């Protein structure tokens, strides 16, 4: 007789270690398939959006930042191969990570950055790193390595934002939209 498994305890431990940037070696490879994991990151993104929305005009960025377009054509998305979806999600996540890091640099250069804003930027950076790690375990990064005889993926649609509120809105919408659709499909198929 072995020790009874405690998936809830494992999930809680994993959620505590992931934001620290520590590899979670004992985590199940399909941790992202647990809806509570993704919902936690979505909630953090929405909280950041709400905090920045609470300001009169919201803190402005000193320059425009390019972010992925979060609009989803559900008909086209369902017709895409999972590999194409993975490429779009991976590219979007990479661009979003760059955008948040750029916002962090702009915030650091401003005089007296709001402490709560800095906290949400730091949480977003940690969350994106964790999501990137979880997607690697899921195998999403492998989809970027396409054979030389295939056509290159369509360029990622982008837009620019000029406030922290808009940046966090894109972050939340990307997680709720493309990332959730992709992980849901992969987890349903059980391919990874």
Swiss-Prot record:
Keywords: Disulfide bond, Erythrocyte maturation, Glycoprotein, Hormone, Secreted, Signal. Produced by kidney or liver of adult mammals and by liver of fetal or neonatal mammals. The lineage of its organism: Eukaryota, Metazoa, Chordata, Craniata, Vertebrata. Residues 1-26 form the signal peptide. Glycans are attached at residues 50, 64, 109. It comes from Mus musculus. GO terms for cellular component: cell body; cell surface; extracellular region; extracellular space. Its main location: secreted. Hormone involved in the regulation of erythrocyte proliferation and differentiation and the maintenance of a physiological level of circulating erythrocyte mass. Binds to EPOR leading to EPOR dimerization and JAK2 activation thereby activating specific downstream effectors, including STAT1 and STAT3. One of its GO terms (biological process) is positive regulation of neuron differentiation. One of its GO terms (molecular function) is protein kinase activator activity. The keyword Disulfide bond applies. This is Erythropoietin.
